[in-house]
């Protein structure tokens, strides 16, 4: 059986995501196949709260065609594109069953993305990057310019968001020595930050509609729309950072300059700007505007802000994801889990009792994720729904 892996956020699960899964099954033809997803939990890569809780999004994914959804733990979920990719690849590799990593791409050319990945891994690339950064370029522009000097026009793949992630996936596969093959699927719908077209819309556009209380059902699968409506009725959605803004600002104002330094992973002095801004800012947007410089994208700053709020440091990131936490699955996924438990390289978590058998490092990571989940629920629209300890009490959704 062919097993495809997808590294995702599904924030929320929409028609474009279903199209990708359906396309994988079409590519498999008559051969039996399964789809395993490594999905971010309650917080996501752009440094923000997911619009609905992880189990709801995982259920929507399985009802939309996925077979098994595993959680990408917090430190990797709110990391850079490089860290996000490394965590996702680590999970898929640890299953021992995934043979192909599929992802959307603006260029649709895995070989081109692999060439760019190899360029970024060259021993002379860091020096070339530093030279470009010294010219005052943003990190993204400097990276593309440095890569262009090594591989020419192929460096253009470092301009588009999905291609950039694809390059990072290829890098992670190369660095880990994994036998998983990359599969770039040409995107035929709107871009990462685009609006809507032909019945499809970007996740960011859908989140904007949902946050504003507008109807986005035309862009969601019927199952995803129904699940989201259920979450809203229960007072659990939409979730936004603005709902937790006072808690976030309170945490940041209580921190000293040395505290902020713990979350500045690049040791680039950003922590001083955060410390100064946190003293006076009356909103998260105001704080980020005060910290912003030409060199850093807002997503980078939001990730650092979220890491500070949730107390996630580089020390919390093991070399590999130490467990496979199941969020949702169907019957095919359950059968796959039996194989994973026998041949996988990481323990599978389906209930809280499984945590006690983990290594000390893995237990610490799970506890961190559980604490973050307790902070996440406090951003629910209705506090009556914000009961804590969900990570310890909620099991997988079986579809």
Enumerate the predicted regions with their spans.
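N-terminal catalytic cores of NTP/NDP-binding nucleotidyl/phosphoryl-transfer enzymes
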Residues: 1-57
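N-terminal cationic-hydrophobic initiation segments that often serve targeting/anchoring roles
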Residues: 25-29, 62, 92-93, 174
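Short loop/turn motifs at secondary-structure junctions
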Residues: 31, 65, 96-97
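A structural micro-motif
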Residues: 32-33, 67, 178-180
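A glycine-rich helix N-cap at a beta->alpha junction
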Residues: 59-73
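Active-site cores that bind ATP or allylic diphosphates and position pyrophosphate for catalysis
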Residues: 72-399
């Amino acid at each position: 059986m062919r097993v495809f892996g997808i590294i995702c956020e599904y924030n929320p699960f929409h028609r474009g995501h279903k199209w990708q899964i359906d396309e994988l099954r079409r590519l498999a033809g008559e051969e039996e196949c399964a789809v395993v997803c490594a999905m971010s939990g309650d917080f996501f890569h752009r440094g923000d709260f997911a619009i609905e809780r992880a189990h709801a999004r995982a259920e929507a994914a399985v009802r939309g065609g996925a077979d098994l959804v595993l959680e990408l733990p917090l430190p990797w979920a709110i990391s850079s594109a490089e860290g996000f990719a490394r965590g996702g690849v680590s999970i898929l590799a640890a299953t021992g069953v995934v043979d192909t990593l599929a992802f959307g791409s603006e260029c649709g050319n895995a070989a081109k993305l692999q060439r760019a990945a190899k360029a970024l891994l060259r021993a002379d690339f860091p020096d070339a990057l530093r030279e470009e950064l010294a010219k005052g370029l943003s990190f993204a522009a400097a990276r593309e310019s440095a890569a262009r000097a090594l591989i020419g026009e192929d460096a253009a793949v470092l301009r588009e968001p999905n291609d950039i992630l694809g390059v990072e996936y290829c890098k992670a596969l190369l660095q880990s020595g994994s036998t998983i093959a990359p599969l770039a699927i040409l995107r035929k719908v709107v871009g990462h930050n685009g609006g809507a077209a032909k019945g499809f819309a970007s996740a960011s556009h859908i989140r904007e509609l949902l946050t504003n209380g507008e109807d986005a059902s035309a862009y969601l699968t019927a199952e995803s729309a129904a699940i989201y409506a259920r979450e809203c009725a229960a007072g659990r959605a939409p979730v936004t950072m603005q709902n937790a803004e006072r808690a976030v600002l309170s945490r940041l104002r209580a921190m000293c300059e040395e505290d902020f330094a713990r979350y500045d992973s690049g040791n680039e002095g950003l922590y001083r700007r955060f410390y100064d801004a946190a003293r006076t800012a009356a909103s998260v947007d105001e704080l980020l505007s005060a910290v912003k410089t030409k060199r850093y994208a807002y997503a980078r700053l939001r990730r650092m802000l979220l890491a500070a709020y949730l107390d996630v440091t580089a020390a919390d990131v093991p070399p590999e994801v130490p467990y496979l936490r199941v969020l949702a699955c169907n019957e095919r996924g359950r059968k796959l889990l039996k194989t994973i438990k026998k041949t996988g390289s990481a323990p599978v978590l389906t209930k809280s009792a499984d945590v006690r058998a983990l290594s000390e490092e893995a237990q610490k990571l799970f506890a961190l994720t559980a604490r973050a989940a307790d902070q996440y629920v406090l951003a629910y629209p209705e506090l009556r729904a914000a009961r804590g300890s969900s990570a310890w009490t909620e099991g997988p959704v079986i579809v």
